[in-house]
């Protein structure tokens, strides 16, 4: 961006280009500039990712859409700054509501998954040779030892095949 003058590439222009990229070919542009406003006008303060003098995009019939100047009060801005997410179209994101029964079912599935995983690791621990006096191996230690054991057995088989063929 250093090759372009700063006045040509500022956040207002970039936001305008981003809004234009969301436009559908069947619909008019997402919004119009108010008459007499230049892109370098400092009055184009950003709100919800677009300039204030640019009208909000509302879904509906394209003929019925009228772009109005967004005057908005400060309360909406404060609510959004508190962490409530906003989608590209300016609507608040819906939080997924999980019922008690769904949570219980998910907990049961997770317990079953963990039980099966622990069973598989116990079976692997029994197959991998370890010293009898060692404490129970952790999962990562079991996997690393299994890798070494499999590599050793593979080399042993390959050396036996070479002796038989040669």
Swiss-Prot record:
Primary subcellular site in the record, as a coarse category: nucleus
Subunit annotation: Heterodimer with TCF3/E12. Interacts with the bHLH domain of TCF3/E12.
Protein name: Fer3-like protein
GO cellular component: a single term: chromatin
Domain bHLH positions: 101-153
Biological function: Transcription factor that binds to the E-box and functions as inhibitor of transcription. DNA binding requires dimerization with an E protein. Inhibits transcription activation by ASCL1/MASH1 by sequestering E proteins.
Protein keywords: DNA-binding, Nucleus, Repressor, Transcription, Transcription regulation
Gene name in the database record: FERD3L
Compartment(s) where it occurs, according to its Swiss-Prot or TrEMBL record: Nucleus
Pfam family, one: HLH
Ranges for region Disordered: 57-88
PROSITE patterns in UniProt: BHLH
Species this protein is from: Homo sapiens (Human)
Highest rank taxon of the organism: Eukaryota
Compositional bias of kind Acidic residues: 60-80
Keyword Repressor among record annotations: yes
GO biological process: cell development; developmental process; floor plate development; negative regulation of DNA-templated transcription; regulation of dopaminergic neuron differentiation; regulation of neurogenesis; regulation of transcription by RNA polymerase II
Signal peptide: none
UniProt cross-references to CDD domains, sorted A to Z: bHLH_TS_FERD3L_NATO3
